[in-house]
Amino acid sequence: MAVGFSGLIVAVFFFTAIAGAQSVQTRSQALNAVFTDYWQDHLRHTPEDATVLGDKRYNDRWSDLSAEEIHRSVERSREYIQRIRAIDTAGLPMQDKLSAELLLRTLLEDQESVQFREWEMPVNQIHGIQFELPQLVAVIPFDDVKDYDNYIARLKRVPLLFEQLTADMKLGIDDGHVQPKIVSEKVLAQVNSIAAIQLEDSPFYAPTKKFPASITTDEQRRITGEISDAIAHDVIPAYQRFARFLETQYIPHGRADPGIWAIPNGDAYYAFCIRSNTTLHMTADQIHQIGLDEVKRDEAAMLVIANKLGYKDLKSFNAAIKANPKLHAASKEQLLDTYRADLEQMKAKLPELFGTLPKAGLIVEATPAYTEKQRPAATYEPGSPDGKRPGRVVVNTYNFAEIDLGGAESIAYHEGIPGHHLQFSIALELSGIPEFRKKKEYTAYTEGWGLYAEQLGKDVGFYQDPYSDYGRLQGDIWRAIRLVVDTGLHSKHWTRQQVVDYFHEHSSIDETNVQRETDRYIAWPGQALGYKVGQLKLLEFRQRAQTQLGAKFDIKKFHDLILDSGALPLDLLENSVNDWIASQK
């Protein structure tokens, strides 16, 4: 059959279109294969994450913390980078392109972290296996005999974990990558505290106190005996050996200067910390100035409240708050109940503010006694993706009589709802994006959202009690102070006492928190910057949308836009916001 010239053109176009469509599909499949392989590799090499996410495949082991494995991980990252860059993303769906960009950034940042030898300083009083191991016990499933046997296998491997950790830290001593003495002394106190817990009170022993009905009495007896034996002969001796290493070898080599500038290549490393935690290209000087400006703004707003309540200045008002026992917790349970009440009132407001709400519930509990002296005022622990395990707001009740109840409301919104619990839970339950994006964190996004959530409470009419509103501002100025003191410590060579003095001059934070927070910033360079930088950006995005859309602005749609793609670097989130604004006009 003859075909005319015009028919030939149509045929060529038709087959080209099919080939192009197949090419897009093939490339999309290849890209998603990279995402899947990467995530499975991550779970395989980070079994603790798999456990938290409800994946039982690796519940009999821990991560390999050895230097050799660190170097192997670099090679794996290189391979994934090559695979991503080999795929042409032109014409692929927007989410595929975004996922490729996010994974590429993650891999490159991981490699940079290794180059700065972060792994040679693997523990501090905020993060470290010394308390992350017992904390993990609370989320390990114990449904059958295999779960218990896996747990016993893990307990027996604790000595190897600490041996690897010790070897890494010895390399750090040789390279000059060591924590300040004040940080390592706090780690030593934590390690000794856990090692000294009596067997039946040990968090490692807790799984024996309640067995599923399906496990026979004989098996319960065997399991209890093997867990007891592993704690006595593997876990506790490993903690004790690590304590001796800290005391006799590591702490004597500890830094006297608290700033990260004091380690080799410290200034470049701090620039990396800024970039990693803010996801923006900002200098320490820029951030320092933003902090000074925000402190001044918050102090002016706080003075308005103090004046309304009859006080001429912040100093006299702060002194009155500290001296009034009615404004402080009378018991640990009262403090916890205050958090619960604040979360309940916010929960009722959520349908007005968000289109997407998570399945996972939320509970409030106290920080374990063995870590409370060094832990923050409150933290959040995510629930499981299927919603069966609730998220947890973990409140530090140490020295409860010093804790100003006026600050509880804003912290509850930050750690719980609409803060971390909402953001993390929605991310875990997302569909249509790769698994790695559901669990990814960017400090400026996650902590910026937490601080945005505190302000959102004000925007929708909460903080009716002036002391709670003052507490909100105290929390806000706290985060502004972080910009000043973190950059002060790690870029401007501030001493620890300068940080303490700045806190005293510009806040009424109780002394326990002043000391604890100061040491936190010493131990964790740059992390504290993400809160305020992220909050200011999110507020900027919302104001931009409100200004440009006017009556068309929908707060629920805006919040869903921010949360429904998982955590994003702020520059990519800004692109998403700008595209959304254009689509709504």
Each model region followed by its residue ranges:
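Bacterial N-terminal signal peptides
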Residues: 4-17
